[in-house]
A protein has these predicted regions:
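ASCE RecA-like P-loop NTPase motor cores
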Residues: 1-174
Length: 174
């Protein structure tokens, strides 16, 4: 609510998206906010709704991490709910991981982290589309500060501010 909508919430799974959407939909009055959930509309319609609606909040998965251009004050915040690691059981990912392991390398550090960092960078790139764009990035996944590999993600941020307290966060956003 601090940014009056104008926010993308990016998810790595539909189950998490649906859970949070259903948990939050009554928190945002319909007359004040437009909640847009992936699969309720085609992608192009969701983007159009986001650009033209009052105080929009978009809940999206994979296809909204990249290739969406919303410039200026239309998008003020990108919230990343979880670091975008590929599902290791995906057949292509699984084959790549096995090949890396066969060569005696650490597949997590050599492949999975770099791929997730690229996707992460694409996700936060939704916010800054031109030299004059500004906004807030909120990362809900505490692995960026608790795990050693988190520094790879934090290094991609334009300005790195880590805040633990809700009141501090709201003050900065406003």
């Amino acid at each position: 609510k601090a940014t009056r909508g104008h926010c993308f919430l990016l998810f790595t799974s539909y189950s998490a998206l649906n859970y949070l959407f259903n948990s939050l939909k009554n928190y945002f009055p319909k007359e004040d906010y437009t909640l847009i959930k992936q699969n309720d509309h085609p992608r192009h319609e969701m983007i159009r709704l986001f650009k033209t609606s009052k105080n929009p909040v978009l809940f999206g998965t994979d296809s909204f991490w990249e290739g969406v251009d919303v410039q200026g004050n239309q998008l003020k915040m990108v919230m990343i709910t979880k670091l975008p690691f590929k599902v290791p059981s995906d057949p292509v990912t699984e084959a790549i991981i096995e090949n890396i392991k066969k060569n005696g390398q650490n597949a997590f550090i050599e492949y999975q982290v770099p791929q997730a960092v690229i996707k992460f960078k694409q996700g936060i790139g939704r916010l800054i589309r031109s030299k004059t764009d500004t906004g807030n990035i909120i990362i809900l996944d505490n692995r960026v500060i608790k795990k050693r590999y988190g520094s790879y993600f934090l290094k991609t941020l334009p300005k790195n501010i880590v805040i633990d307290k809700r009141k501090e966060l709201i003050k900065i956003i406003k």
